[in-house]
Amino acid sequence: ISQVLDTKSSMVSGADALPDSAEAPELEFRHVSFRYPQAGADALTDISFCAAPGETIGVIGGTGSGKSTLANLIPRFYDATDGQVLVRGEDVKTLQLQALRTRIGVVPQKALLFSGTIRENLRWGSADASDEALWDALRAAQADGVVRDKKGQLDAEVEPGGRNFSGGQRQRLTIARALVRKPELLILDDSASALDFATDAALRKALSKLPWKPTVVLISQRVSSIRHADKIVVLDDGHMAGLGTHTQLQ
């Protein structure tokens, strides 16, 4: 464990602060390609699209098409092999890593909850969040009913891995945790896959009405989940097979 903790990250932080505002798109991929170390082929090839502040970008494709890889390049979990990923017109490689990541909310495919209480889990998003802010996030994530049904509500126990919650409940709680931070850029990586269609639709409606109007990257294998996005990126084996609205792509 000590060796792991002492290992230095190969990800070098940039020096620039994230601009408070810019006329440039909130998010832009500019001819981005990515190849994993020792891989024989690119996982992503020549991906280009942009999202204005407050827009929702849908990303769809089959298993192994590169959706999660695309998501991981935005907060610099990996760096693009070629091309640029830009936030507010600035290459993410030039930005201070902490400043970049504190403005991004990422909800991965596998919902992860920690041992403790629901309140403690949600406050990983923002340590000083008020109970009112927690309930606001829960309502937006369609998780307030889940918490109200638990004895103790916000003080209800969360077992290791969230095993005392269903898959759909864990997903909604992890989305709520991301919303507590009020991120300016929200990445949902197939993180509503366990939700029924009605709850998924209610979640998307709530996200569109968030008062701080985040830019949303919504990754899904369900057409119904992304059909109302402002733009849809269609991935096929790491290549961009389409870009446009649902109507344009039909």
Give, region by region, the residue ranges found by the protein language model.
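Cytosolic ends of transmembrane helices, especially the final helix of ABC transmembrane type-1 domains
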Residues: 1-4
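ABC-type nucleotide-binding domain
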Residues: 6, 11-14, 20-250
